[in-house]
Amino acid sequence: ILESTMYQGENYTTSFDELLIKKSQEKGIELHELESVDFQLDLLNNLYTWDDVKATISTVADSTKKEETIKYLKDTFNAYVNGNIEFLEEDVANMKKEVPEFYDALVTQRNIKMAENIDNLVEDGKNHTIAVGCKHFIGEDSILKELEKRGYTINRL
């Protein structure tokens, strides 16, 4: 929600998720969620207190921090678009080192579950397109590594 609010301040009116959903609906492509909104909200509710939320909102309201956050989000987006995997790997590694309990809940455990959901999804033998945040594809605890553990061969295009 906070990211969306910041992007709106930068005149971005549609999130990438919204764009993918709209394009899929226009083309009649069936959508399946790897995580429900309720799951994500429950996860955040279990990780953050109301004081954490207020502190984050206060930080975002601070114009300097807001600009830093927007720059970080743009840098992340540009790294993804330009294939700068090193930037993304460093960011993921920093999170794992600096806040391991959050990393485990927000990255590792979710990636294990999403890989399981992908494995179940592809059992029908049909082609599927999977969309998740780019950092879920990065690092030693990534969805890709989890799929490799399940016997899949991963090729970067």
Regions found by a protein language model. Give the residues of each.
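A cross-kingdom marker for long, charged
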Residues: 101-157
